[in-house]
Amino acid sequence: MELAYMAKLPKEEFEERRTRVFAQMQPNSALLLFSEIEKRRNNDCTYPFRQDSYFWYLTGFNEPNAALLLLKTEQVEKAIIFLRPRDPLLETWNGRRLGVERAPQQLNVNEAYSIEEFATVLPKILKNLTALYHVPEIHTWGDTLVSESAVNFSEILDWRPMLSEMRLIKSPNEIRLMQQAGQITALGHIKAMQTTRPNRFEYEIESDILHEFNRHCARFPSYNSIVAGGSNACILHYTENDRPLNDGDLVLIDAGCEFAMYAGDITRTFPVNGKFSQPQREIYELVLKAQKRAIELLVPGNSIKQANDEVIRIKTQGLVDLGILKGDVDTLIEQQAYRQFYMHGLGHWLGLDVHDVGSYGQDKQRILEIGMVITVEPGIYISEDADVPEQYKGIGVRIEDNLLMTEYGNKILTAAVPKEIADIENLMNF
C-alpha cells in the first residue's frame, strides 16, 4: 500500500479555514496561536516533534517555535506567521527550516517575520485593536513572548470554542485521510491477530503492530498502545505491555496509528490461543451485541446518549442473565450497578487528536451531524477480586470502531478488522 503521496492536505484548505475564522472574529481584533516546541526527553535528546493540533489546523506548518496571528480590521484581513529564521549550521545538524522568505508563498499567508522579532513587531501590528483571541497557559513559551511585547487589551477572548467546533466537522480531504488512518490501523490489528500465540510477550505484539503502521507511512501511533493480556485488560489505560501472554487468556489490544496528523483508534479482544472459552464467549458476545446496537443508533439526528442508554440496558440485562448482576434490570440501571463493570463512556470524537475537541452537549445529548467522526467502544471489565461467578473473573473485553457520520447513516472506517468470533478464530488459526 503506497500512501505517502496521499498524506497531505492542499495548502488552500488551511487558507479556507482561516477565512472561516475571520468571518467569526469581532471587528478590530486579532487571534493568536502558538505552535508546540520540542520536548526534552533527557540530557540533549528530544522526543520526536508533534505539532499542536490547533496550530496545524490553521497553518499546516510542522515546525516548532512559531506563531500565527490573524488580524481583522475594517480595512483588511491578514494572516501573519512568525517562525524560526534560516540557519545553515543548525539546519546541518537538526534539519531544514522553511524560513521567513519562503513562508508567505509556501503557507499562503500575507506576511512572515522571524520569531525573534515577535516582541517588537507584535505591538505595532496590534495597535488600535480592541480584542485579542488568546488562551494563556497552553504554551508557556508563547505567554512569555506576549508578556515581553507588553500588549494590553480591554477584552481577551477564548478561541477554543470557535476552532473546536470547526474541527468537529470533517472536510472531504480530512475524511480521506481518516479513512486511510482507519485502514492502516486495521492492518496493524489484523497483524496482531495473526502473530499472537501463547508465551509471546505483550511488547512483542505491540512491536508487530507498530511495524505494520510504519510499513504503511504511519510512523507514530496516535496514542500509547495497550496490549493487555488476561486480567491486565481490566486496567483501562494499561500501557506497561511487559507481561507474557498465557494460554487460555484473552488479550485486549487498543492501538491506533497517526496518518498525516489524523488518528485511528481500534480496540479488539481475542483469545491468545485462537479459541474462545465458553465464559469468554459469553462476555464477548454481550459486548458485541451492545456495540452493534450502538452502531445502529449512532447516525445523524441521534445523540450519543441515546446509544449509550441502549448499551447500558443491553449490558445490564446480559449481566443479570449470566448471574453477574442480581436484581431488577430497571432498578440496577437506576442504581448504576453496571458501573463496576462498565465505567467509561461509549465513545469520543476522533480527528487530529485521538480524543478530539468539540462539545458533546449536556449529558452527551448533542445531535450527531454529517461529517463528525466518533468512536464506539463498549466494554465489560470483571476484575479478579469481583464478587461474581469464578469463571468470569479476570475477563476484560472492549470492541472499538471508528464511525463517520454520513447522509446515509454512518460508515465504519475500521470494518476491515474481524470482530465476529468465527472470523477471529478463522484468522488466528489460518
Swiss-Prot record:
Belongs to the peptidase M24B family. Homotetramer. GO terms for biological process: proteolysis. Mn(2+) 1 binds at D265, H348, E377, E400. InterPro entries: Aminopep_P_N, Creatin/AminoP/Spt16_N, Creatinase/aminopeptidase-like, Pept_M24, Peptidase_M24B_aminopep-P_CS, X-Pro_dipept-like. Mn(2+) 2 binds at D254, D265, E400. It catalyses: Release of any N-terminal amino acid, including proline, that is linked to proline, even from a dipeptide or tripeptide. Binds 2 manganese ions per subunit. GO terms for cellular component: cytosol. SUPFAM superfamilies: Creatinase/aminopeptidase, Creatinase/prolidase N-terminal domain. This is Xaa-Pro aminopeptidase. Gene3D superfamilies: Creatinase/methionine aminopeptidase superfamily, Creatinase/prolidase N-terminal domain. Its cofactor is Mn(2+). It is an enzyme of class 3 (hydrolase).
